[in-house]
Amino acid sequence: CLYDVIGDAKIRPNQLFSMSLTYQVIDTNSEEAKNILNVVEKKLLNNYGLKTLAKGEENYVEIYEGDGYKRDTSYHQGITWPWLLGLYYDTLRNMIKSEKDKTSKKELQARLNEFVENTKKTFTKELYERGAIGSIAEIYDSKAPYLPKGTIAQGWSVAEIFRIIKEDLQK
């Protein structure tokens, strides 16, 4: 895994920036990249986004609740953010592009397809049945029932989910 700062080995989603951008910092065909993806999938990914901190890490918070101070300090301590799904999506696409082995490429494509289908299913329900009808919340609790919290209609959440769906429809 990559860490946010030297001396802090907490697992966070920021490591995906190194592989999700147009010009990746890490070779997306490397073992390091595959390890990062596996850790993110196992420890941070859920249907509503990526947790900002892995469960079990010091200061982990999975429910966004309490007074203003408690809520503000929990934002980046495990709460789920939908917009971070865009980093995961772009990382998978970059890994597929750079993968030379046909079997591995097929497996990555299957993971991407499953992810996109889950994203469509999850957020179609959100758009029509929960929270602010027609929108997506800023954040979600990181445990079932994954309640929408924070800003009830967040532009960057909507934008990333719509981008994932739109790009999938255009392929």
Protein language model features and the residues they cover:
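Feature representing long, continuous alpha-helical segments
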Residues: 38, 79, 83-90, 110, ...
